[in-house]
Amino acid sequence: FTIVDARGHWLAMTSSIEDAFGSRLMINGLLMNNQLTDFSFVPELDGLPVANRVAPGKRPRSAMSPTFVLTAKGKPLMSVGSPGGSRIIGFNTGVIARWLQGEHDAGELVSAPHALNRNGFTELEHGFPAERRAELVARGHDIRDVDMASGLGVIVRTANGLQGAADPRREGQAAGY
């Protein structure tokens, strides 16, 4: 999620207990996470240690990447964040790319169809433009049609103030006071 307060302080944050309801265990009213599933349970590959192996005191790798876009003087222009596991970086990068290409409407930024590649086949969401799909196929992409519930949250600075939006694919909303 992303927040701007009345004093102009910005916050972009991703919080997770991994799966929906985490480990499905509750202690004193708090759901316990299952973040250990983010580790690789194969400690070695080809005789070499795997970077994301389980070890005491280690934290698992994460794609969480709440992001700010700033002016040259450090003034926030946009903040974006999303849940979504290993797809998070692609979700956030898609919003930033659309913003850099001139789309500054917060609702359009978070609701556009996703296209992601996580070092394998290319995932396209329903509604992805057919002509762009054809370009990817022509370049040799192995295309898979998938549903993607990103849950993006974005705030953009416009000439008229701030505009926020929440991804319509998940529960969430933008609010201003």
Feature map (PLM): residue ranges:
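Proteins synthesized as precursors that undergo proteolytic processing into mature forms
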Residues: 1-146
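Cofactor-centric catalytic regions
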Residues: 127-177
